[in-house]
């Protein structure tokens, strides 16, 4: 296997002094042995409110550098926040490129009718790492016809 496909050492910078003091608790971590996503926490000093239908940008207090163009990180909503409280990501999915080195910021959108409160170091999102395929393109005049060919949305029906 090619080296770039097996290198999964991600560099992390701790930007929040409280995280530095207790990094084993505040760093991204898997909640259970079977978890796919690493929990990301709100690096805030005091409780903040997120009014109904509003969007807010919340810092995590960390920065990562993936440094491998064949790996990317996806920031996803936490299922409980979305289902129970109507809190999802403002951009639906966050894409962290391998060369990005800035602080991870979480765009939270309150789609509920109620004010939502975020406490310091609440788990607000999750992050997964996925492999990336970087294709090359070949310019052609025509495609070899398939059964589907150019049929678009809904072409196969619902049953």
Swiss-Prot record:
Keywords: Hydrolase, Magnesium, Metal-binding, Nucleotide metabolism. SUPFAM superfamilies: dUTPase-like. InterPro entries: dUTPase (IPR008181), dUTPase-like (IPR029054), dUTPase-like_sf (IPR036157), dUTPase_trimeric (IPR033704). Its EC number is 3.6.1.23. Coiled coil: none annotated. It catalyses: dUTP + H2O = dUMP + diphosphate + H(+). Pathway: Pyrimidine metabolism; dUMP biosynthesis; dUMP from dCTP (dUTP route): step 2/2. GO terms for molecular function: dUTP diphosphatase activity; magnesium ion binding. Pfam families: dUTPase. Its cofactor is Mg(2+). It comes from the Bacteria. Transmembrane segments: none annotated. It is an enzyme of class 3 (hydrolase). Substrate binds at residues 78-80, 91, 95-97, 105. One of its GO terms (biological process) is dUTP catabolic process. Belongs to the dUTPase family. This enzyme is involved in nucleotide metabolism: it produces dUMP, the immediate precursor of thymidine nucleotides and it decreases the intracellular concentration of dUTP so that uracil cannot be incorporated into DNA. This is Deoxyuridine 5'-triphosphate nucleotidohydrolase. The gene is dut.
């Amino acid at each position: 296997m090619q080296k770039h496909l097996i290198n999964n050492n991600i560099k992390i910078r701790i930007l929040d002094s409280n995280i530095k003091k207790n990094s084993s608790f505040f760093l991204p971590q898997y909640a259970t042995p079977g978890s796919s996503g690493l929990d990301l926490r709100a690096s805030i000093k005091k409780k903040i409110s997120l009014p109904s239908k509003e969007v807010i940008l919340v810092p995590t207090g960390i920065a990562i550098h993936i440094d491998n163009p064949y790996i990317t990180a996806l920031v996803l909503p936490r299922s409980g926040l979305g289902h129970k409280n109507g809190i999802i990501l403002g951009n639906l999915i966050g894409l962290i490129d391998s060369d990005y080195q800035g602080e991870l910021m979480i765009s939270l959108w309150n789609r509920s009718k109620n004010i939502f409160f975020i406490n310091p170091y609440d788990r607000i999102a999750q992050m997964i790492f996925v492999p990336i395929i970087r294709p090359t393109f070949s310019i052609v005049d025509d495609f070899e016809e398939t059964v589907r060919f150019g049929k678009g949305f809904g072409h196969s029906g619902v049953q």
